[in-house]
Amino acid sequence: MTVPLIQNPEVLESRLKEIPAEPGVYLMRDATDQILYVGKSKKLRSRVRSYFRFTGDLSPRIQRMVVQVCEIEFIVTDNESEALALEDNLIKTYQPPYNVLLKEDKKYPYLCITWSEPYPQIYITRHRRLNQNQDKYYGPYTDVGLLRYTLGLVKRIFPLRQRPKPLYKDRPCLNYDIGRCPGVCQGLISPEAYRKTVAQVAMIFQGQTDELIRELKEKMAQAAQQENYEAAARYRDQIRGLEQLGQSQKVSLPNSTASRDAIALAMNDSRACIQLFQVRAGKLVGRLGFVAENRGDDPALILQRVLQEHYQYCDPVEIPSEILTQYELPDRDFLESWLSQKKGRKVSLLAPQRQSKAELIELVERNAQLELARSQRLAEREAAALERLAEVLDLPEPPRRLEAYDISHIQGSDAVGSQVVFIDGLPAKQHYRRYKIRNPQVRPGHSDDFASHAEVARRRFSKMTSEDQPDLVLIDGGKGQLAAVMAVLAELGLDHLPVFALAKREEEIFRPGDPEPLRLPPQDPARLLLQRLRDEAHRFALAYHRQQRKLRQQASVLEEIPGLGKQRQKLLMEAFRSLARIQVATEEQLAQVPGIGPKLARQIYRYFHPEAETELPATAE
């Protein structure tokens, strides 16, 4: 079908009748089969039909979309929650031009508690692993420095495991001696007792610090009555630490003790900046920012999309019972039903007009306006830097897509390459790529930066398409690295691409065919932009190199276990994700890994716990 449905009423009506009145997702395609829009509804038929009534309810942008629709597809789901999750996945996969698309602003950090382990770890991460259903993620948090400070303070208040893996095989480390750790590595505390401590820590990150303080005060009083003064003093110190944490972590809002989220936005011609405030027990405990392109969307639709994105991966305990919105949402009933089902209790979405709730929305909106102004200043600064870059490098126009490449290794060991991408002067991390160097000439004791750069260039640019063609390529290095890359591009017929190298010492810019490097003043906007691009490539390559080196070192430990070949080592690492978790796993957990079995699990366990070999089974009387 290449004719728009709007031009063929009979076909349109036939297509609409095929759509069931059930929950699900619909996809609208144009004459080239491109997906223009993805939507969801409790009743697919009535929602899709509403696009073709032309009653004036549609925005001008959506009206432009409707006249292009040549085909409508639908996917029926069992319920609204499945429809919302599917819609979210399809939008992220296909990036339809008429959907509200959130920009890759930043990955906020989370706090993870690994309840899937007998002795749960508590750590900060920017990557949520959704396949471990028992693990809990708290956040996201906008200030990673404050999160690190909070976690550090929590680890001083409560005795928790301080290391991901034991320092010694046969004895606890200094953290046990000074009371910072209960001796997890040597089994000096039972999993049940340790998990009770971790549950108290979880209350802090669920916004239940006041409740935890009340609980500890009751225990302190009870311990004092029983003349257990050592325990009472320990509870007293924990209470003081929690009160200090509460003072440093939260901002009180006037005339409120409620827990709710509030969301508002500010827009200009190009973008929308959205702010979401998280209020728990009358205190502001978190503030999140989102950025969306402004393509003529209804502001309420943008807010709705952000809420879907945010709560999609939230733990149910993180969803408040009340969410305040700047505008009335078009799918409010749908979202309330989905959130209530996810939380297991009623969740209300309100667009307040007066009193304290409206004042909170006004506060969020003011912060969104400030963020929009900051974002606009940043965009103008980057635009000026790109114009300057085009000027000094003789480019026909300011480059939009910039790519940088770096190599990282130690004397040829664990050699890797990195590709980072900036779009409009800002990192576009969804386009970053990492490369393991495969060249046999690059091996421990034999490094070859030129060959490594050539390999990465060949692997990247042999697969280049018109959609990901860079406007500028930057190599971390000097003349030699630049020549190696240009030789590969010449083989591929791509030597017309603008490629440059930036040397670290003098920050000299090398250009193909020019024996003299270009030197720019230290504060030149073009130089500063190239330095940021190069430094990001270096950071990304170094992080990947360290990861590969760590994996190799972990694998070398596993290689010492008899009967544990490469394939089984890989299965163990995939199941537990780190050597530290393998070391503290029980025999039963090890045996559950496919391909391991009880016998090999016992062998692995005894390798890390040699004291277990001396424990004889009890004999029958």
Curated annotation (Swiss-Prot):
GO cellular-component term (any): cytoplasm
Assigned keywords, A-Z: Cytoplasm, DNA damage, DNA excision, DNA repair, Excision nuclease, SOS response
GO molecular function: DNA binding; excinuclease ABC activity
Entry-linked InterPro entries: DisA/LigA_HHH, GIY-YIG_endonuc, GIY-YIG_endonuc_sf, GIY-YIG_UvrC_Cho, Hlx-hairpin-Hlx_DNA-bd_motif, RuvA_2-like, UVR_dom, UVR_dom_sf
Pfam families membership: GIY-YIG, HHH_2, UVR, UvrC_RNaseH, UvrC_RNaseH_dom
Locations listed in the record: Cytoplasm
UniProt keyword Lyase, yes or no: no
Record domain UVR: where: 210-245
The organism's place on the tree of life at top rank: Bacteria
Coiled coil: none
Entry-linked PROSITE patterns: GIY_YIG (PS50164), UVR (PS50151), UVRC (PS50165)
Gene3D superfamilies: 5' to 3' exonuclease, C-terminal subdomain, GIY-YIG endonuclease, UVR domain, UvrC, RNAse H endonuclease domain
A GO BP annotation: nucleotide-excision repair
Record domain GIY-YIG: where: 21-100
Subunit composition and interactions: Interacts with UvrB in an incision complex.
Family membership: Belongs to the UvrC family.
Functional note: The UvrABC repair system catalyzes the recognition and processing of DNA lesions. UvrC both incises the 5' and 3' sides of the lesion. The N-terminal half is responsible for the 3' incision and the C-terminal half is responsible for the 5' incision.
UniProt protein name: UvrABC system protein C
Lineage: Bacteria, Bacillati, Cyanobacteriota, Cyanophyceae, Synechococcales
Gene name linked to the record: uvrC
